[in-house]
């Protein structure tokens, strides 16, 4: 009886140690760091408030999404975004708009004044495509002129090759993809601001 009790205790301890080992595996937090333009604000330019972007399911999570070969989706447990894709993209776009010589001020809501424009959007997808070996992002953005007139609507998508099989390689490619869509949106917004009569358009 005593030996049986000792065996049960040992088994319980081993199971507990295994659980502790699983729980202490570190989570790797990732943040998009796209290269940003080297400009500044435009003196006397219009003002814009850039709100938090939404993210379409199943990408409305901090877990890194992977499209495996065969089209199956997987979501990492130990590799997570430091914020949701919508939050990160909106923050990086906000930073970029402060460097594109387009606006006199770029605000995070709530803005301290009634801005001339409001920029809203959503991340349609952000994932690691294993089959095409690329980092893919697709976003949509709407530019609203005060008080509530649609001044522009665009969809941008970029796919950048992932040069390696590590999460670091994916992160570098994803950051480059975000930089590409931000650069494209910069051109879209510049065109809309230069032509007040411009009709909303979509990238082919």
Description of each model-found segment:
Residues 18-85, 192-204:
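A structural "domain/chain start" motif
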Residues 44-46, 60-62, 69, 77, ...:
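Envelope-exposed proteins and targeting segments
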Residues 74-80, 147-184:
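Short secondary-structure boundary motifs at beta->alpha junctions and helix caps
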Residues 86, 90, 94, 100, ...:
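Extracytoplasmic/secreted envelope proteins and their assembly/folding machinery
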Residues 170-204:
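Compositionally biased, intrinsically disordered linkers/stalks adjacent to structured regions
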């Amino acid at each position: 009886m005593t030996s049986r009790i000792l065996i049960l205790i040992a088994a319980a301890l081993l199971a507990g140690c295994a659980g502790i080992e699983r729980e202490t595996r570190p989570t790797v937090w990732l943040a998009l760091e796209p290269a940003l333009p080297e400009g500044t604000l435009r003196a006397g330019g219009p003002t814009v408030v850039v709100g938090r972007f939404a993210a379409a399911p199943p990408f409305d999570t901090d877990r890194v999404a992977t499209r495996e070969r065969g089209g199956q989706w997987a979501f990492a447990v130990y590799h997570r975004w430091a914020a949701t894709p919508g939050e990160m993209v909106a923050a990086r776009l906000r930073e970029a708009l402060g460097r594109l010589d387009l606006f006199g001020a770029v605000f995070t809501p709530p803005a301290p004044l009634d801005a001339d424009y409001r920029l809203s959007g959503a991340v349609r997808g952000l994932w690691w495509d294993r089959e095409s070996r690329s980092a893919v992002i697709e976003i949509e953005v709407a530019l609203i002129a005060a008080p509530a007139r649609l001044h522009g609507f665009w969809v941008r998508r970029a796919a950048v090759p992932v040069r390696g099989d590590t999460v670091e390689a994916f992160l570098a490619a994803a950051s480059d993809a975000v930089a590409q869509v931000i650069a494209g949106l910069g051109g879209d917004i510049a065109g809309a601001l230069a032509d007040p009569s411009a009709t909303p358009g979509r990238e082919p």
